């Protein structure tokens, strides 16, 4: 059991049970998965950029990233169906908890002028998405070796029914939301 999962089970669960007065422990919201995505439009012309993105995303996540390909051809973007346009990885169980711990305690505080995450990223069903402008904030990547800093999307999928429950869950786990 990871450090953050232990905090969830021992501290967050009783607080949420009291706050929302659930009748069953199965109603308690939890984190289902974390999805990481890097979109690279320029990678359709530059294959080296795509390989670099996959390697870096794999290092950040701790498991192999998958290349995402274009579903449709779009002439204005010089894009053909099947061309590589990004990379993604889905984390579950222990890797998910480890990544969330690393994100909240190491990566986000390394962002320049960090004052917390805005809570606008909730989707109405308790899931939270945030964008990062530079992926070099993660400790696995050496800033000197990264040629092209890339942005990425991080989606935290919860079993919470509402945004209020989802925000409370992430807040109790230590997500640094803006006050």
Swiss-Prot record:
Keywords: Ribonucleoprotein, Ribosomal protein, RNA-binding, rRNA-binding, tRNA-binding
GO MF annotations, alphabetized: rRNA binding; structural constituent of ribosome; tRNA binding
PROSITE patterns hit by this protein: RIBOSOMAL_L5
Record bears the keyword Transcription regulation: no
Quaternary organization: Part of the 50S ribosomal subunit; part of the 5S rRNA/L5/L18/L25 subcomplex. Contacts the 5S rRNA and the P site tRNA. Forms a bridge to the 30S subunit in the 70S ribosome.
The family this protein is said to belong to: Belongs to the universal ribosomal protein uL5 family.
Name this polypeptide is given: Large ribosomal subunit protein uL5
Upper lineage: Bacteria, Pseudomonadati, Thermodesulfobacteriota, Desulfovibrionia, Desulfovibrionales
Gene encoding the protein: rplE
